[in-house]
Amino acid sequence: MDSHDLDLVFSALADPIRRGILVKLSDGEQNVRQITAAFDVSQPAISRHLRTLGKAGLIRKDKRGREQFIRVNADPAEEAAAWVGHYTRFWKHHFDQVEDILAQTRKDTEDDNGP
């Protein structure tokens, strides 16, 4: 996943309504009417949110007759989680090193000051 795609995913996930839509879709695919009924926003607003989620690759749309059914595509979220996980491990390692240095500094200070 390139930087631009990652930006789209994080931007899409930044909105509480879009996160709510993904939670609703975790129960299974739904049509736009069903999704709209679950939120206190207009159908055009839901359509804009769905468009943003679609650009980020977080949902897939299937048109059947006159209805459009939406389902979750977890792949981009998993890739974003892997990115976050990488940097979580990176910073944890560096914070552990700082903690070790501070502990050694405290010990050295105590040794210098005596009992």
Language-model features: locations:
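C-terminal regulatory/oligomerization modules of transcriptional regulators
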Residues: 1-5, 24-38, 43, 52-55, ...
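Short helix-coil-helix linker/hinge
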Residues: 12-17
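Pre-recognition alpha-helix immediately N-terminal to the DNA-recognition helix
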Residues: 19-21
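Short, Lys/Arg-rich nucleic-acid/phosphate-binding segment
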Residues: 63-69
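Residues within the DNA-recognition helix of helix-turn-helix
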Residues: 49
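Conserved N-terminal beta-strand and adjoining loop/helix that marks the start
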Residues: 7-11
